[in-house]
């Protein structure tokens, strides 16, 4: 059997691995900045266009609705043409959407902003499918969640930079009621996208193929993963991601309104600044999560964080004054690891379905399209504080997914607190099952052995038991 075309992260030299990791990680900063500005524009447009909180969530509907529509297509595109071309397409759409913010601001058209945001969302959906999937498979599955948390930590850095910029230039002086600053900020964002596109064109980014990934998991005794519709961990991961992202986006969309309405004398400018501090808390939590995920099983840690998110979201909806503000900061901290953990747990060991599965999980970001609208309707009808009951449902769904994975693992192989290298465990099982050689032909699903067929059947059963 000829070796599979392409490579895997574990086959790269240390230098090429570090280069690929750093280059793809730069993409996380790109969409973190755009996302950080989005929630601030939500409040800014309420003032400039004299629209309600519910109407302002059209931005979230366009941005996250683009993920729902475009992410599956992006996964299919990269399955055929590879990660690098997918990154080029994503950066191109991202820059194009940002450029159209200029005429929208110039002619004061809220609909233009909504349309431009949709195009940006399509670009970022493509980048998320590429970057999240690439980082997840760029090495051992044991550290996939830690790697993705580290890379997405830079998304958090950019996320608090957006509100910080807004607090200085969107809400002060004449900028509080105009869009002059918005158009220049987004022209700079478009320029950043163009520069990154040029850098990726001239850089040698190693292509990690699904054939190579399939061969890698075959080497440790994992049989054919079966059709895509049977990848229940991935399908339920999409449900969990849809619910979680919807909750996260709803929480962030009304932070400025929530802080101003708390009755403790917080202005819009000060609220935007505090929002950036919330994002700093989120980012710090993500880097702390990198350390924790080296030692604690990702599904178990996600279960704990999901329960904490549920509790503090309820706290935000009920507590008044600075008590609610404190619960809000805690909520941002415990949100930190959720998205990367759901992604890596849902796409683990998919083999030939890796890119398609990545597209499905990223499609879950579309949950951010309708949660803010539901929350905005409740905020208009009751209060911003009470509207934070809406995200609670999303955190509960995410927690059930994580707890389900923990229970499933406990039933099959016993309860596991520590994070373990499953590939190493399976290789050891294969070696024990085949003492004559313990080796697989590279890229094959049969073993070199002189063991009689009757003994081989028992050995294969041992391997399949470890797979469970």
Describe the residue ranges of each PLM region.
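Cytosolic juxtamembrane N-terminal segment immediately preceding the first transmembrane helix
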Residues: 1-31, 47, 226
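Extracytoplasmic
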Residues: 19-51, 131-132, 162-166, 251-259
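Extracytoplasmic gate region of multi-pass secondary transporters
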Residues: 38-42, 163, 167, 226-276
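Central cavity-lining transmembrane alpha-helices of secondary-active solute carriers
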Residues: 58-76, 276-288
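Conserved MFS/SLC helix-loop-helix module at the cytosolic interface between two early adjacent transmembrane helices
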Residues: 69-111
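C-terminal ends and interior cores of transmembrane alpha-helices
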Residues: 92-107, 307-320, 403
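Intracellular juxtamembrane helix-capping segments at the cytosolic ends
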Residues: 126-143, 336-352, 357-359
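Helix-loop-helix hairpin linking two adjacent transmembrane segments in secondary transporters
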Residues: 141-208
């Amino acid at each position: 059997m000829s070796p599979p075309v392409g490579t895997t992260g574990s086959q790269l030299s240390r230098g090429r691995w570090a280069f690929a990791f750093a280059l793809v990680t730069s993409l996380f900063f790109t969409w973190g900045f755009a996302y950080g500005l989005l929630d601030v524009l939500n409040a800014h447009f309420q003032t400039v266009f004299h629209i309600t909180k519910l109407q302002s969530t059209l931005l979230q509907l366009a941005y996250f609705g683009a993920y729902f529509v475009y992410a599956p297509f992006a996964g299919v595109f990269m399955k055929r043409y590879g990660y690098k071309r997918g990154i080029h397409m994503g950066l191109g759409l991202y820059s194009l959407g940002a450029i159209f913010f200029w005429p929208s601001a110039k002619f004061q058209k809220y609909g233009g902003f909504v349309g431009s945001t949709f195009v940006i969302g399509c670009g970022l959906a493509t980048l998320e499918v590429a970057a999240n999937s690439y980082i997840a498979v760029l090495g051992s599955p044991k550290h996939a969640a830690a790697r993705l948390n580290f890379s997405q930590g830079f998304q958090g850095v950019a996320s608090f930079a957006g509100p910080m910029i807004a607090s200085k230039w969107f809400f002060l002086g004449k900028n509080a009621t105009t869009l002059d600053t918005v158009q220049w900020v987004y022209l700079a964002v478009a320029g950043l996208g163009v520069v990154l596109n040029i850098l990726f064109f001239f850089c040698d980014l190693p292509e990690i193929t699904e054939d190579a990934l399939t061969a890698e998991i075959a080497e440790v005794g994992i049989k054919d993963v079966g059709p895509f519709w049977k990848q229940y961990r991935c399908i339920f991961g999409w449900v969990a991601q849809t619910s979680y992202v919807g909750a996260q986006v709803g929480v962030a969309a009304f932070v400025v309104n929530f802080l101003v309405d708390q009755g403790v004398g917080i202005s819009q400018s000060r609220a935007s600044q505090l929002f950036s501090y919330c994002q700093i808390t989120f980012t710090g939590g993500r880097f702390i999560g990198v350390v924790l995920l080296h030692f604690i099983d990702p599904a178990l840690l996600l279960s704990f964080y999901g329960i904490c998110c549920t509790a503090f979201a309820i706290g935000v909806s009920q507590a008044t004054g600075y008590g609610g503000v404190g619960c809000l900061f805690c909520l941002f901290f415990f949100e930190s690891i959720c998205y990367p953990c759901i992604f890596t747990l849902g796409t683990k060991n998919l083999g030939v379905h890796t890119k398609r599965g990545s597209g499905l999980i990223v499609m879950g970001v579309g949950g951010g399209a309708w949660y803010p609208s539901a929350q905005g309707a409740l905020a208009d009808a009751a209060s911003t504080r009470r509207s934070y009951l809406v995200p609670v449902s999303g955190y509960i769904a995410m927690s059930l997914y994580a707890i389900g994975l923990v229970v499933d693992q406990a039933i099959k192989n016993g309860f596991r607190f520590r994070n373990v290298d499953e590939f190493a465990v399976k290789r050891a099982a294969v070696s024990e099952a085949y003492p004559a050689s313990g080796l697989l032909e590279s890229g094959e699903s049969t073993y070199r052995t002189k063991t009689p067929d009757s003994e081989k059947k028992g050995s294969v059963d041992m391997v399949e038991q470890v797979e469970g």
